From Swiss-Prot:
The keyword Flavoprotein does not apply. GO terms for molecular function: ribosomal large subunit binding. GO terms for cellular component: cytoplasm. CDD domains: RRF. Responsible for the release of ribosomes from messenger RNA at the termination of protein biosynthesis. May increase the efficiency of translation by recycling ribosomes from one round of translation to another. The lineage of its organism: Bacteria, Pseudomonadati, Chlamydiota, Chlamydiia, Chlamydiales. It comes from Chlamydia trachomatis serovar L2 (strain ATCC VR-902B / DSM 19102 / 434/Bu). This is Ribosome-recycling factor.
Length: 179
């Protein structure tokens, strides 16, 4: 494992954390709320983003325009089945979703999930650091000074990525508090 590969793995953890938390409902309409919803169409299960365009019509409303108008009812059922606390409204060949303002209880629950997920991401980053350091110590070709230098660099990377995760979590928490 090289320093560059460790950094790439850490960046992957950060990206995964961003994707996981993007779907948290903050009270503002955002396509990420429903794009991963699975829908039963054409005899198979597909992601909503693969069968429809999802747009924001205003701050609290999503507009879903299926590529095939025959999938409207399946999309509505898929959204209801996803238990997102969202009520789809079928309007001809489109589905409209009014995003309700989150309740205080919901906000507390999402903040708990957010903190748990951010801690899991930081643990994953620290595990990458530990694996890197373990491999360094087993490498007989490196001098003690080289090992110390690389350990310092991997620690700097770890701190950088953990800080980015904390900042993203704080931003998301602030979004939840201001809506």
């Amino acid at each position: 494992m090289t320093l560059a590969s460790a950094e790439k793995e850490m960046a992957g953890v950060l990206t995964f954390f961003q994707k996981e938390t993007r779907g948290f409902r903050t009270g503002k309409a955002h396509p990420a709320l429903v794009e991963t919803v699975t829908v039963e169409v054409y005899g198979t299960t597909m992601r909503l983003s693969d069968i429809a365009s999802i747009s924001v019509s205003d701050m609290r409303q999503l507009l879903i325009s299926p590529y095939d108008a025959g999938t409207v009812s399946a999309i509505s059922k898929g959204i209801l089945a996803a238990n997102l606390n969202l009520q789809p409204i079928v309007e001809g060949a489109t589905v409209r979703i009014n995003v309700p303002e989150p309740t205080e209880e919901y906000r507390r629950e999402v903040i708990k999930q957010l903190k748990r997920k951010s801690e899991e991401a930081k643990v994953a980053i620290r595990n990458i650091r530990r694996t890197f350091n373990d491999r360094l110590k087993k490498d007989d070709n490196l001098t003690e000074d080289a090992v110390k230098s690389l350990e310092k660099k991997i620690q700097e990377l770890t701190d950088k990525f953990c800080k980015q995760i904390e900042e993203l979590a704080k931003q998301k928490e602030a979004e939840l508090a201001t809506v």
